[in-house]
């Protein structure tokens, strides 16, 4: 889309200086012989950041816990890629409810653009980041954000969780050593059934009420839904394709409701649509194509959205149950979607590295 434009290049010896220049708003200006600005435009920095920080794809990002060989002790490490940030801090809380008790300053690696901190935050603690970054047209702002690489969160994505996915407390009985069914020899022979977690069981009276619309609905082998899936597997179905089960924005993870539709209205009439839209902000249903955190399970499908460990454990239980029915499990990943951009409260990536992740008109 820029192919017809003029190409300008910086001298090779400016590469290191460019790392610092990109931490402030940059403009390209055309200046006439009298020193007057004729034209001015902000720069699109994504390509430059890719060129400068390609090595940032190698180190692990997010949270790592456990034995750290360099220090010969157990520790927690937080890592965030924010190459244009002026400062990054982490606000640590001992659990999902307590206010932040510690604020720590992350250190920047100028070659990778990764900010990191290592300390003694225990599994089960929670955190958010404070990212100080220049916003074009605004100036320096401080954004409180969750970790885009979170593996789990508290209710409504308020805080990221310090978890080790290898922790036995997150592993259902039988998880270690568990094997999924063998796949089809050729991909063309896969038979895939697309399924929405909530819709699978929300209205199934054979599922215990507290598990309807939840991950744990799959663990009840004698329900209408699971009997149906086993029958499909016996008939040749090979794979379940789950609509998004990563953390998404549009369903309140606590206190969501099922819309009360207008009595007597035509099913295909405008009254029904208006009734649903009027209650959309609290509706328990959404397809989930508005990701907040790609690597964390959605909390509205868990029996306790407030406890970050529960959603991880229960999603694993659901996967094991589907494998037990003879079905492999895949997940719809929509990396071309985000819930929001800019300074919106449900924008995560764009409030960490403004202008990098999304190309907007």
Residue ranges: model-predicted function:
Residues 2-73, 109-117, 121-217:
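The feature marks proteins involved in alpha-glucan
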Residues 198-361:
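Substrate-binding/active-site clefts of carbohydrate-active enzymes
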């Amino acid at each position: 889309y820029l192919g017809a434009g003029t190409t300008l290049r910086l001298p090779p010896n400016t590469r290191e200086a460019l790392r610092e220049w990109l931490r402030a708003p940059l403009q390209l200006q055309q200046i006439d012989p009298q020193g007057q600005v004729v034209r001015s435009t902000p720069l699109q920095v994504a390509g430059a950041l890719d060129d400068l920080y390609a090595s940032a794809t190698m180190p692990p990002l997010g949270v790592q816990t456990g034995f750290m060989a360099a220090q010969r002790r157990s520790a927690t490490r937080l890592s965030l890629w924010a190459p244009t940030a002026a400062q990054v801090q982490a606000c640590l809380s001992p659990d999902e409810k307590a206010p932040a008790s510690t604020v720590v300053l992350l250190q920047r690696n100028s070659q990778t653009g990764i900010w990191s901190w290592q300390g003694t935050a225990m599994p089960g603690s929670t955190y958010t980041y404070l990212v100080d970054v220049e916003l074009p047209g605004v100036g320096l702002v401080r954004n409180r954000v969750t970790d885009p690489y979170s593996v789990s969160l508290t209710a409504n994505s308020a805080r990221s969780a310090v978890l080790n996915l290898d922790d036995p407390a997150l592993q259902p009985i039988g998880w270690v050593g568990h094997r999924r069914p063998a796949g089809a020899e050729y991909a063309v022979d896969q038979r895939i059934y697309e399924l929405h977690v909530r819709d699978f069981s929300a209205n199934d009276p054979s599922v215990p009420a507290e598990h309807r619309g939840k991950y744990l609905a799959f663990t009840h082998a004698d329900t209408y839904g699971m009997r149906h899936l086993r029958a499909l597997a016996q008939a040749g179905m090979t794979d379940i394709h789950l609509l998004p089960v990563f953390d998404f924005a549009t369903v309140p993870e606590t206190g969501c409701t099922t819309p009360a539709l207008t009595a007597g209205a035509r099913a295909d009439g405008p009254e029904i649509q208006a009734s649903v839209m009027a209650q959309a902000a609290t509706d328990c249903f959404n397809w989930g194509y508005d990701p907040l955190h790609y690597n964390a399970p959605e909390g509205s499908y868990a029996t306790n959205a407030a406890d970050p460990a529960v959603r991880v454990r229960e999603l694993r239980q659901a996967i094991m149950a589907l494998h037990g029915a003879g079905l492999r499990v895949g997940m719809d990943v929509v990396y071309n979607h985000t819930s929001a951009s800019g300074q919106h409260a449900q924008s995560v990536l764009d409030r960490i590295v403004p202008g990098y992740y999304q190309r907007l008109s």
